[in-house]
């Protein structure tokens, strides 16, 4: 466990399976097959969300019949999860997952004192699984310095991978998430939840993220792209550090069909760009946070079609009467 080498990889797509929609381990296995069919590389399973969870019975069925690598999470209530039982039993479920060849085990930073025992358990069972140390931050995204401190604390545990999740109250907070990838010495999963945090998933490959999370068809999750859109509209496997970012600035923005129209056009002309929806609350703050050259141009929707003129270097006379307009940073 642990490495000082920065991993180079193509981003992996992780299906977030909301396990409370399934009433049996067999149905969870079916959900994993659905995730694979929709393009997922890995599946995250929340044991704390499984109704009437029986660790030995359910984990055996799930892990012995998995069609994809599995990340096991057993999130306690004190970290935003649903588990309220005995802490030792919670950790025992993770140890059992190790014995049954889980590919990734998630351990909260606050519970990192259990890592030596878990690592020894992995060695005793010849496990090749990886340990993810995670931290979920309540409230708005903290300042950059606080986030860096959390990253350093998680790295110091010796984890193979670290994971940091915040709640985005404003899209400009996501820039702090993107900046963390420059400082991390192990693979990092970092994103913000909620509709304003969507770009933290879609642009993760550009900045060096290890996972991108997606939702299954028929089970949308706020702030997560669907697995289908990752494959068909955004084609995140082609996004890299040189990718130019375009997007729709609007509030709300989930209705936009722009990604379906523009991203295929980029690919048709072999242009390294991505078009994403951007839920923006404050135009001035947004433009000062995401300047050129990486953020190259924007379409503007309601309620900013008139206000955006104040931020343009030049305005073509025809733009005054257009229903929507393209803003280009010069």
Question: Where are the regions a protein language model picked out?
Answer:
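Eukaryotic N-terminal low-complexity, Ser/Thr- and Lys/Arg-rich leader segments
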Residues: 1-13, 232-242
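Active-site beta->alpha loop and helix N-cap motifs at the rims of alpha/beta catalytic domains
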Residues: 3-145, 159
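Short beta->alpha junction loops
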Residues: 17-23, 136-138, 165-168, 276-283
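Structural motif
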Residues: 24-27, 143, 147, 173, ...
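Short beta-strand elements of ligand-binding domains
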Residues: 71-74, 133-135, 190, 318-329
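Catalytic alpha/beta core domains of metabolic enzymes, predominantly
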Residues: 104, 110-244
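Phosphate/diphosphate ligand-binding glycine-rich loop within oxidoreductases
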Residues: 243-330
């Amino acid at each position: 466990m642990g490495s000082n080498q920065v991993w180079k990889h193509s981003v992996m797509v992780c299906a977030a399976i909301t396990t409370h929609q399934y009433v049996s381990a067999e149905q969870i296995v079916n959900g994993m097959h659905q995730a694979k069919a929709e393009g997922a590389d890995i599946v995250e399973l929340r044991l704390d969300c499984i109704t009437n969870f029986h660790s030995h019975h359910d984990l055996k069925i799930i892990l012995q019949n998995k069609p994809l690598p599995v990340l096991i999470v057993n999130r306690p209530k004190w970290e935003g999860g649903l588990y309220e039982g005995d802490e030792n039993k919670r950790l025992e479920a993770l140890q059992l997952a190790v014995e049954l060849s889980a590919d990734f085990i998630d351990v909260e930073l606050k519970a990192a004192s259990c890592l030596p025992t878990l690592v020894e358990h992995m060695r005793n069972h010849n496990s090749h699984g990886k340990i993810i140390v995670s931290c979920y931050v309540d409230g708005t995204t903290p300042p950059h310095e606080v986030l860096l401190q959390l990253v350093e604390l998680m790295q110091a545990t010796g984890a193979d991978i670290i994971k940091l999740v915040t709640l985005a109250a404003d899209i400009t907070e996501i820039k702090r998430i993107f900046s963390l990838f420059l400082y991390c010495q192990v693979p990092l999963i970092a994103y913000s939840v909620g509709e304003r945090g969507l770009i933290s998933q879609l642009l993760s490959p550009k900045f060096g993220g290890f996972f991108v999370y997606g939702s299954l068809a028929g089970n949308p999750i706020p702030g997560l792209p669907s697995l289908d859109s990752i494959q068909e509209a955004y084609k995140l496997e082609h996004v890299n550090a040189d990718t130019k970012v375009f997007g729709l600035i609007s509030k709300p923005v989930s209705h936009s069909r722009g990604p379906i129209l523009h991203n295929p056009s980029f690919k048709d002309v072999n242009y390294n760009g991505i078009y994403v929806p951007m839920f923006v609350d404050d135009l001035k703050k947004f433009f000062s946070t995401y300047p050129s050259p990486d953020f190259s141009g924007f379409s503007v929707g309601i309620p900013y079609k008139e206000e955006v003129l104040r931020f343009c270097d030049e305005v073509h006379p025809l733009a005054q009467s257009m229903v929507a307009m393209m803003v280009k940073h010069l």
